[in-house]
Amino acid sequence: MLLRSGSKYIITAEAREEIKKRNGKLVTIDEMVEVSKSTQLDSVGDVTTTNLRRAGAKLFLQIVDLKTKRGESIFQHEEGSITVRNDPGTISFDLIEAIKSSIENNKPTRIEVIGEEDLAVLPIIYYSKNNTVIAYGIPDVGMAALTVTDDLRDHVTEVIAKMAIE
């Protein structure tokens, strides 16, 4: 994901359609707690992250924006978190770098996003090793998960190629 400082990827209609082709499987909290015992588990979204933590899941990456789907700020900042800006419908250079650094340095990290974290799943897939599991929330539905494979990473590369760069 080559991007220069200050730049960002912007979702396009074509990229959004490509994303829809690979939805994760609906999962339960208990399933994800079990997964976290033997596999790297990352979470995207405040409700997903909070529920997994309360249930005792071991999380490597936690990416949150401290808001609910309605925009209410009901979640709290945690000391030691990395804070990055990421506008809705985009993937910022700073978000990519925070994810990449955490994965490359094998350092569990909580990233608090000012803006929106929804598209963070893409750079997580791009940089994660195979078999990493990423849990994320689907509003009004539940929680879904994707397992990183070479095929999924190739799909993400195609999605990114269809995004605009600003």
From Swiss-Prot:
It catalyses: 3'-dephospho-CoA + GTP = GDP + CoA + H(+). This is GTP-dependent dephospho-CoA kinase. PANTHER family: GTP-DEPENDENT DEPHOSPHO-COA KINASE, UPF0218 PROTEIN TK1697. Keywords: Coenzyme A biosynthesis, GTP-binding, Kinase, Nucleotide-binding, Transferase. InterPro entries: GTP-dep_dephospho-CoA_kin (IPR007164). Belongs to the GTP-dependent DPCK family. GO terms for biological process: coenzyme A biosynthetic process.
